[in-house]
Amino acid sequence: MSTARTENPVIMGLSSQNGQLRGPVKASAGPGGGGTQPQPQLNQLKNTSTINNGTPQQAQSMAATIKPGDDWKKTLKLPPKDLRIKTSDVTSTKGNEFEDYCLKRELLMGIFEMGWEKPSPIQEESIPIALSGRDILARAKNGTGKSGAYLIPLLERLDLKKDNIQAMVIVPTRELALQVSQICIQVSKHMGGAKVMATTGGTNLRDDIMRLDDTVHVVIATPGRILDLIKKGVAKVDHVQMIVLDEADKLLSQDFVQIMEDIILTLPKNRQILLYSATFPLSVQKFMNSHLQKPYEINLMEELTLKGVTQYYAYVTERQKVHCLNTLFSRLQINQSIIFCNSSQRVELLAKKISQLGYSCFYIHAKMRQEHRNRVFHDFRNGLCRNLVCTDLFTRGIDIQAVNVVINFDFPKLAETYLHRIGRSGRFGHLGLAINLITYDDRFNLKSIEEQLGTEIKPIPSNIDKSLYVAEYHSEPAEDEKP
């Protein structure tokens, strides 16, 4: 079975068994960094890309068309309004507006055209502090607008008259680098001359070297690749004023911590560091004490799990798992689902089984070629398939708002892994389901994770209320439909 789509992909809908429709999946735009993100086009799928958002002359021309006193918002191309009800994870705000932060109008235009209407709680806390130049240590849930929280001040502080790298965003996975770069490109599209480059392992190093020979203002990278470019003298970072560590707990784990230490040592001493993470292990605290100067600490996590995600478990034997999954597919109204396995081999075997059952399915794991991973990520994000089977490669920051069901086919060993997995549904305050298939060997781990996260994972009922996870059952009426 091939998971990549070539030409004219034919998608097998899940028929009337579970009420799902054939054809591409659509997700509404959402405000505040958690909205439906612009999809990467095929010519942008190379994991290393430099994007020039117009020229200064084009920006001036655009600005000239908006005369002082005009209602410039009327010129915006806004996405459809997201009418889905949201949880307090994103609605419990102070009532601030993006205009309150005195941002450039060109940046505001990009923000509103993303469908971001008002700042989310993490954005209200982060944006003004980041604009002041102070270091930040922020703890916030997955899917609450963290990308917007750091990209907005990062773009506001760029000096486009200079032709050097001024900001870096470091992320742990190639897919997350692609996603963040696409958001950055879209938000900055009205800022004439802003150049954003994504660079990750698994792509041609020569391409990176050629792109860095031209002007680049923002680099979004995985740790190993950017350190390699710095050591080669290709990526000149002596003018970097801001570095962001997204998913900092992963970046400062044993896999990456020495690389991150080496990167920080190459930066100017007066650089600003922004750390964002859902969990703060000892490694993050140690890094903070060594490198952050009187950081402003943000903690928006009274509880760890997203309020919109309802969690269930089903006791099964290993042999019953595929049958149980088939039952879930037939009974649930799935918009898109992500199914997690604990190894690459099990991912491929399960994807084959799902395909044999007659359901559309892609798979993705770290052992696949990068261009193949890019294609799968792009196609699933664009709604060309309902179900994605994957390893924990897909747990970090990936924001696909159409996903309303996450299934742990294999239960994870760590509470942190569980937290990031179920955070793929219920993005930006919306509702979703997390269903765990639990074997006899998993029972103690289930209890341990419940206790560590302070959450409740309930036995799965025979019928699951659609209002817990289906958008049509929990949407607000449109303005013109309200009484």
Swiss-Prot record:
SMART domains: DEXDc (SM00487), HELICc (SM00490). The modification Phosphothreonine is found at T36. Its EC number is 3.6.4.13. GO terms for molecular function: ATP binding; ATP hydrolysis activity; protein domain specific binding; RNA binding; RNA helicase activity. Residues 308-468 form the Helicase C-terminal domain. Residues 1-57 are annotated as: Disordered. It is found in: Cytoplasm, P-body; Cytoplasm; Nucleus; Cytoplasm, Cytoplasmic ribonucleoprotein granule. Essential for the formation of P-bodies, cytosolic membrane-less ribonucleoprotein granules involved in RNA metabolism through the coordinated storage of mRNAs encoding regulatory functions. Plays a role in P-bodies to coordinate the storage of translationally inactive mRNAs in the cytoplasm and prevent their degradation. In the process of mRNA degradation, plays a role in mRNA decapping. Blocks autophagy in nutrient-rich conditions by repressing the expression of ATG-related genes through degradation of their transcripts. This is Probable ATP-dependent RNA helicase DDX6. It comes from Mus musculus.
